């Protein structure tokens, strides 16, 4: 059963409003609270589970609907409560604004559950939690894992060519060397108490280059525990591209489950012996796979083609300068 986080918080007696100490811990959120509440939807017993709730965050161009036919049913089968947060404009707008939705989601889900929140994000969805953790320090004590599937932690060289005639704000910000990513990755990339798993594929045609653990997705600095895992390092002949890594891939899912069920980030050495034979993750119905992938591709293509272009990267917020 799905319900808004606002309803869940009322049921468990939690409050969305931060304490005065929390209000001072990071910049005030500019997005109206009603919009933040409306973007957050949960499934399962978030308030009563013995497990950390999972926050699913989709990538640029996509919405939480992308999880309905993969991670949603898979996590339900595992008995894991989860929530989704819809980033504004399918994640195409200013990522600094999208980060406020993530901050609110972390605070609200943690308050509703009384537990840490484990984040699983694809592409931008695997990177934007790091902006939340960097600039809203109170969120760090509320997060257990950040699991990025083909995350755009250091951007992509592909965006530079795409943005020459102008492009969506989020594309500008995910260019390698953008002001946004320079700010994000200045200083420590990770934080103590948070475990970071970054799953990448050498066949990633969107977040590139990703040929090894010094590629676009990987992290190396800070006090968080980090695991950068190449799918082809686990399974040398494995075929997975950018979209499938975050939506259907069986090996990526096995790494997600390993991170969620152990202390610390994912460890490929713990994967089942038959992990490389699992082409599709649980929850994906092979009968409807082609239809669901076609729908996803249509959403991506429509957003890329029709979302309004801007001539330059959005200015950094004052708190990030």
Mark where each language-model region is.
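Hydrophobic/aromatic beta-strand patches that form the interior of the parallel beta-sheet core
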Residues: 55, 83, 147, 197-199, ...
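Secretory targeting and sorting signals
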Residues: 1-23
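Short, surface-exposed basic-aromatic patches at helix termini and helix-loop junctions that form
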Residues: 75-76, 134-139, 217
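Sequence contexts marking disulfide-bonded cysteines in secreted/extracellular proteins
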Residues: 41-43, 162-168, 234-236, 275-277
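Serine-dependent carboxylesterase/thioesterase catalytic core
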Residues: 58, 85, 96-190, 206
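Active-site catalytic motif of lipid deacylating hydrolases and related acyltransferases
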Residues: 25-31, 39-116, 290-294, 299-318
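Surface-exposed patches in mature extracellular/periplasmic domains of secreted proteins
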Residues: 87-88, 115-119, 265-273
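C-terminal catalytic-base region of ester-bond hydrolases, centering on the histidine
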Residues: 192-321
């Amino acid at each position: 059963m799905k319900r808004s986080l606002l309803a869940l918080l009322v049921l468990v007696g939690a409050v969305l409003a931060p304490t005065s100490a929390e209000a001072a811990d990071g910049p005030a959120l500019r997005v109206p609270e009603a919009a933040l509440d409306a973007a957050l939807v949960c499934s399962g017993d978030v308030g009563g589970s013995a497990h950390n709730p999972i926050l699913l965050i989709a990538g640029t161009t996509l919405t939480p609907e992308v999880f309905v036919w993969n991670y949603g049913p898979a996590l339900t089968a595992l008995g894991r409560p989860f929530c989704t947060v819809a980033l504004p404009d399918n994640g195409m707008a200013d990522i600094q604004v999208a980060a406020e939705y993530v901050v609110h989601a972390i605070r609200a889900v943690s308050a509703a559950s009384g537990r840490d929140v484990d984040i699983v994000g694809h592409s931008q969805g695997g990177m934007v939690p790091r902006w939340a953790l960097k600039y809203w320090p109170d969120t760090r004590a509320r997060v257990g894992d950040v699991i990025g599937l083909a995350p755009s932690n250091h951007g992509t060289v592909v965006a530079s060519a795409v943005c020459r005639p102008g492009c969506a704000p989020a594309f500008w910000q995910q260019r390698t060397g953008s002001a946004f990513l320079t700010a994000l990755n200045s200083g420590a990339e990770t934080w103590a108490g948070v475990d970071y798993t970054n799953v990448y594929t050498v066949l990633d045609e969107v977040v590139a280059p990703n040929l090894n653990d010094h590629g676009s997705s990987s992290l190396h600095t800070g006090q968080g525990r980090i695991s950068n895992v190449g799918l082809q390092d686990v399974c040398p002949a494995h075929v997975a591209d950018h979209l499938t890594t975050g939506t259907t891939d069986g090996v990526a899912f096995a790494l997600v489950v390993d991170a969620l069920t152990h202390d610390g980030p994912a460890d490929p050495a713990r994967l089942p012996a038959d992990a490389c034979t699992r082409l599709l993750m649980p929850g994906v119905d092979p009968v409807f796979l082609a239809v669901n992938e076609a729908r996803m591709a249509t959403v991506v293509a429509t957003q890329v083609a029709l979302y309004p272009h801007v001539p330059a990267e959005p200015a950094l917020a004052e708190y990030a300068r």
